[in-house]
Each structure stands twice: as structure tokens, then as C-alpha cells.
Amino acid sequence: MGLHPSNEELAEMARLLTKARIEHWVGEDFGSWRWWVLVMLLIMPWFIWYKFANKKHLRDLALFGMIVMVFTITLDELGFILSLWHYPVDVIAMFPRLTSVDYTVVPIVFTLLYQYFPTWRSFFWALVATAAIFSFIIEPLIVLMGFYQLLKWTYWASFIVYIIMGLLSRWIVRMFADIEQKNSNP
């Protein structure tokens, strides 16, 4: 290896890491109680969402949820790559993020906030309360249970990120709704 690893060397390291991750997942995670909890968290919230989501506003809710999901997955991937945190267990071995939270829990909870708190003021305060619950109650609990390890990250940073992510997502959806409304009235 020269001063910097070559693309081939980086590809080989990535291959070895993926192989090790799969071997660990098969030997340690798959079928464990923590794995089953994550499977349930990946599936069950969708039933809750289906029951409580206002189907008359499905397009806005789905757009909002997808935007939150994109933010969550992107930020989670970035934090993992920068070694800010680590997930010792996940539903699928190839994903280094907490799939159940990224694809289900956060988008669904935020979508329900968007639906039930329609004004900016009510949404903001509901978002602050939810961010506090996620950051200072749920995250420490999942650290204690071994689902999540903080490396160079804090619960306060999570708190701020949840709030910014929710506000940006709402702003984007409202911006699209305003554009649509302006262009639909002759």
C-alpha cells in the first residue's frame, strides 16, 4: 500500500468488512431477541400508521414521511461512516444503520405529528416534545439494551437534529403544497 490506499485496496477492504458483517450477523444477531424486537419495530408501526393516518391527506403525509425517511437514512449513513455511532445489531446484515428506526419509527411518528399538529406553532412544540422523548428517553434506553452505541455523538445533538429534520421536512411539504395551490387556481 502506497501513501494512500488504491481503489482496488479500498474495494477489498469493503468486501472484507461486508463479509465480516454478514458472518457476525448470522452468528450473533439473526434470530436473537434483539433481532426480533427490530423486526417487530420494522413492521408494527405501519399498522398503527394505517389505522391513524388521515387517508384524505395521504399524498401530503406520504411525501412528508418520505422526506423524513430520506433525511433519516442519509444522516444515519453519514453518522455511521464518520464513526459518530455504531449499531451492534440490525434486521439486515448489509445495512450499517438501524433499519427499523430509519424506515419506520421516525418517519411514522413524524408523519403523525405532521397530521395531528397542523399549525407551525403546534407542530414545533409537538416536535420539541417528541425530539426530547427520542433523544433523552428512547436513545439512552436503546443504548442500555445494546441496540445503539454512541462513539462521538451526544443525546443533545440528536435532539437538535430531530427538530431541524422535522422543521425542514414540514417546510418542504408546505412549499410544494403552496406551489401546487398557486398553479391549480385559474
Which residues are covered by each model-predicted region?
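Aromatic-rich, lipid-facing transmembrane alpha helices and their immediate juxtamembrane interface loops
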Residues: 1-186
